[in-house]
């Protein structure tokens, strides 16, 4: 445990594989390790453009919808948190070191799947981002989800519990096959696709629970509880396999140990533990919330009606 806690005290951005030359000497420097602060490479320029575009679209969308009843403060808070986390894990310190430390990479992926995706769904963020685009593009983006369009019909199918769960599990296991995991590590294009697929499939996973527009969920609370229990099992099994495998599975052994804290096997073990425990705690929290809602619902229906 002390090895993990000492990580931030032994960082060395000077040795980072992306060509950065600034030394890092602890938590403060870790928090300053943002990709777009290092625009001496094409990746740094792309990162800066990516962050700027997302923030601009969001702010324009909020401005255009500010005089409507759609913008609820609680929704804006959820979207803002999700957007900050998205930028932090994809462009900030987490991404900066994710390609060299497996357990940090796992933190990145878990944040995308079990935090950011459900936050965006809970806030029904899509309309704000659509309204942040130019008029012609806005019309093009909104048409596929209106009326009985083909896109809406497809969405209604893939968000059904049996399909959303299956697609999520297939995607999760696919990207943890060593060949494809290592491919994403080695090539930025595949890594980008990897992150997009994680977020998209995670949204499908959470859709039957949260059910935002344009396709509402029709699951009862007991059905949602069963769904979450089924969903958590495959990810827990994968986490257990990674944790208990012993020998390194992925290509982190080709990366020099810059900080001399964790061996590659220990790094992988901690990554599996992070996937196993914090990841499952999110599902446990959802289950607890659903149980309380179910209990309250049952209590309200079982109370005798008072006669006038």
Predicted regions, residues:
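Alpha-helical membrane segments of multi-pass proteins
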Residues: 2-308
């Amino acid at each position: 445990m002390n090895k993990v806690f000492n990580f931030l005290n032994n960082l060395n951005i000077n040795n980072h594989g992306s060509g950065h030359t600034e030394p890092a000497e602890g938590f403060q420097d870790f928090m300053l390790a943002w990709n777009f602060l290092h625009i001496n490479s094409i990746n740094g320029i792309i990162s800066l453009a990516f962050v700027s575009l997302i923030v601009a679209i969001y702010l324009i969308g909020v401005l255009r919808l500010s005089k409507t009843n759609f913008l609820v403060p609680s929704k804006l808070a959820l979207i803002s948190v999700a957007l900050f986390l998205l930028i932090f894990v994809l462009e900030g310190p987490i991404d900066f070191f994710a390609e060299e430390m497996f357990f940090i990479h796992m933190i990145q992926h878990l944040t995308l799947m079990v935090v950011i995706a459900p936050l965006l769904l809970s806030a029904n963020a899509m309309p704000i981002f659509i309204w942040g685009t130019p008029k012609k593009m806005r019309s093009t983006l909104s048409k596929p989800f209106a009326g009985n369009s083909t896109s809406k019909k497809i969405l209604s199918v893939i968000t059904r519990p049996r399909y959303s769960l299956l697609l999520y599990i297939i995607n999760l296991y696919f990207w943890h096959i060593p060949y494809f995991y290592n491919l994403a590590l080695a090539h930025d294009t595949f890594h980008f696709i990897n992150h997009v697929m994680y977020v998209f499939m995670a949204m499908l996973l959470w859709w039957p629970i949260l059910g935002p527009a344009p396709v509402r969920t029709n699951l009862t609370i007991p059905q949602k509880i069963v769904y979450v229990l089924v969903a958590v099992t495959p990810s827990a099994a994968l986490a257990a396999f990674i944790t208990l495998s012993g020998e390194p599975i992925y290509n982190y052994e080709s990366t020099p140990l810059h900080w001399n804290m964790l061996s590659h096997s220990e790094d992988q073990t901690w990554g599996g533990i992070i996937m196993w425990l914090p990841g499952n705690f999110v599902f446990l929290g959802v289950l607890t919330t659903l149980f309380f809602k179910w209990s309250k619902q049952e209590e309200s229906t079982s109370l005798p009606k008072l006669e006038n």
